[in-house]
């Protein structure tokens, strides 16, 4: 991978960024730094830590059998260049993953801020949202991935780090580590109003048990806490004041260590077979990607809405987002696909969160929702693991 310089923000841009978007967490204990190679995967040895109205049904691309287990890990608010630059000493595991597994080099978030990216990845549209306000949940009363999985008899769970209990609708925990805006499943009324469905949204600690007992569902979504996903802002992971602030480096390390731990646990579990894959991506790029720096910030197709700033909402009480201007897509972020025995592959095709959804749906033979059904402008990620 060619060396890339870490993009530096202007003082003005950083001040806006630091007020809203970064964080850090204490280093994890118990992580063994020695990495082993399992197939193509560079992983550590770690201790166990409604109705269907969509496009026609899809089939997996030809080649290998469908994936038995699909894992999605959604990280936060960090750009492709910042993560994969060889000048960043704090994301070494992420760089190893990218160098030894599937890498989509032109993968983009859908928009800013966080929540509509999560909604896009699980329903195929943002439904007009560009806000993190959880009180807008009724807006998302639409068909979603959970509806599809259950209609097809595909087992699923969403594992949320620091979620107090299964299905808990708390907006944020007192320590600030769990935030509902990073949990799309409890933003859909037909999930959070259904006790059985909401019970499948569980604390991340449950995944250790499920991996150890071999009771891992076919579809797994993992959301780290607000420090470990590189977002930050909790008391234990304050916002950095500048790009060179040690708090910024700590955020990188926290996310890198989180992935080192959980990729290791997954790939050393009974669920890790030749028909399993882990999709690792970031919801959106850094704050600098919200400005029209050039074509690298904007991808073609339905993944690139240009939205006006959102004012404060007097109806819901939600604060305004992106008060400084417009949004040019969600920014350039990595998409790393870890699949056993596949090796390093690179796909330069433009892709984004609708591509992730399309890939999941095609794997399980589900209809294609919303923009995931735009087969002209949205391509799947199968070249990275088949």
Q: Which residues does each PLM region occupy?
A:
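N-terminal secretory signal peptides that target proteins for export/translocation
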Residues: 1-23
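Terminal low-complexity, poorly structured segments
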Residues: 18-21, 34, 365
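Generic hydrophobic-segment detector
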Residues: 25, 29-30, 45, 114, ...
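Bacterial N-terminal signal peptides
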Residues: 28-41
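Cleavable N-terminal signal peptides
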Residues: 35-36, 46-49
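N-terminal pro-sequences and low-complexity stem/linker regions of secreted or lumenal proteins
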Residues: 49-386
């Amino acid at each position: 991978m060619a060396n890339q310089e870490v993009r530096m923000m202007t003082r003005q841009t950083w001040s806006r960024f630091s007020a809203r978007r970064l964080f850090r967490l204490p280093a994890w204990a118990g992580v063994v730094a020695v990495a082993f190679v399992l197939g193509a995967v560079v992983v550590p040895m770690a201790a166990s830590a409604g109705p269907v109205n969509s496009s026609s049904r899809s089939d997996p691309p030809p080649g290998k059998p469908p994936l038995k287990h699909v894992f999605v890990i959604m990280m936060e608010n960090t750009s492709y260049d910042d993560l994969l630059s060889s000048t960043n000493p704090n994301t070494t595991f992420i760089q190893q993953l990218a160098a030894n597994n599937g890498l989509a080099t032109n993968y983009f978030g859908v928009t800013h801020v966080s929540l509509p990216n999560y909604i896009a990845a699980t329903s195929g549209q943002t439904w007009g949202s560009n806000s993190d306000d959880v009180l807008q949940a009724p807006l998302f009363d639409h068909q979603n991935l959970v509806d599809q999985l259950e209609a097809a008899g595909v087992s699923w769970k969403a594992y949320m780090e620091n979620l107090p209990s299964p299905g808990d609708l708390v907006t944020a925990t007192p320590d600030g580590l769990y935030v509902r805006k990073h949990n799309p499943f409890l933003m859909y009324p037909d999930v959070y109003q259904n006790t059985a469905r909401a019970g499948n949204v569980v604390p991340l600690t449950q995944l250790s048990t499920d991996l150890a007992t071999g009771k891992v569902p076919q579809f797994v979504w993992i959301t780290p806490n607000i420090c470990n996903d590189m977002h930050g802002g909790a008391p234990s992971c304050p916002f950095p004041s500048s790009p060179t602030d040690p708090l910024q480096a700590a955020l990188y390390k926290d996310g890198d260590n989180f992935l080192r731990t959980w990729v290791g646990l997954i790939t050393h579990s009974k669920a890790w077979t030749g028909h399993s894959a882990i999709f690792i991506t970031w919801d959106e790029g850094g704050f600098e990607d919200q400005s029209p720096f050039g074509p690298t910030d904007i991808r073609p197709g339905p993944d690139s809405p240009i939205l006006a700033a959102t004012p404060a909402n007097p109806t819901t009480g939600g604060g305004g987002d992106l008060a400084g201007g417009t949004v040019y897509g969600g920014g350039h972020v990595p998409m790393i696909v870890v699949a056993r025995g596949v090796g390093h592959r690179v796909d330069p095709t433009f892709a984004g969160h609708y591509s992730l959804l399309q890939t999941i749906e095609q794997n399980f033979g589900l209809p294609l929702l919303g923009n995931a059904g735009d087969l002209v402008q949205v391509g799947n990620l199968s070249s990275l693991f088949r």
